[in-house]
């Protein structure tokens, strides 16, 4: 939820992490802002720029296959999905939102790799603009926190 109380995590340290980002180009004004906020937060958390790999795909439905290719390389400590799905007048919104989300979750479980899902689903452009920076930064924090957690649990 936008503006929700997300609690606080211990100090997040991304110094040793390798992060992969898949960004959809569809609604690029929003996804570029998501990516900028995400990358800025990763750097602030100590992730080295050279350890951040970012690729782009046409839209949200293509995000899972690129994430899968990254997961199969076994080079990344966490992955991040960035996209924006804005409701239109057809069922296509539900299809894209549900299938892209399910694909991201399935990959995280199948490959046992944290994937921060910042494919935002909104009713209109105004909602997307209001959420773009916060959700991009949130995705970076989730990726770093979960990568460190899974490392500690292994």
Swiss-Prot record:
Species lineage = Bacteria, Pseudomonadati, Pseudomonadota, Betaproteobacteria, Burkholderiales
Function as written in the Swiss-Prot or TrEMBL entry: Catalyzes the formation of 6,7-dimethyl-8-ribityllumazine by condensation of 5-amino-6-(D-ribitylamino)uracil with 3,4-dihydroxy-2-butanone 4-phosphate. This is the penultimate step in the biosynthesis of riboflavin.
Does Transferase count among this protein's keywords? Answer: yes
Please provide, in alphabetical order, the Gene Ontology terms of the cellular component aspect for this entry.
Answer: cytosol; riboflavin synthase complex
For the protein in the UniProt heading, the enzyme class is transferase
Identify which residues the record assigns to the active site: 92 (proton donor)
**Reactions performed catalytically:** (2S)-2-hydroxy-3-oxobutyl phosphate + 5-amino-6-(D-ribitylamino)uracil = 6,7-dimethyl-8-(1-D-ribityl)lumazine + phosphate + 2 H2O + H(+)
Q: Which residues bind (2S)-2-hydroxy-3-oxobutyl phosphate?
A: 89-90, 131
Q: What are this entry's molecular-function GO terms?
A: 6,7-dimethyl-8-ribityllumazine synthase activity
Q: What is this protein called?
A: 6,7-dimethyl-8-ribityllumazine synthase
Q: Which residues hold 5-amino-6-(D-ribitylamino)uracil? A: 26, 60-62, 84-86, 117
The record's annotation in NCBIfam families points to: lumazine-synth
What's one GO BP annotation on this UniProt entry? riboflavin biosynthetic process
Recorded hits in Pfam families, A to Z, give: DMRL_synthase
The text of the family note is:
Belongs to the DMRL synthase family.
Q: Which CDD domains match?
A: Lumazine_synthase-I
The pathway to which it is assigned is: Cofactor biosynthesis; riboflavin biosynthesis; riboflavin from 2-hydroxy-3-oxobutyl phosphate and 5-amino-6-(D-ribitylamino)uracil: step 1/2
**Entry keywords, A to Z:** Riboflavin biosynthesis, Transferase
Q: What is its EC number?
A: 2.5.1.78
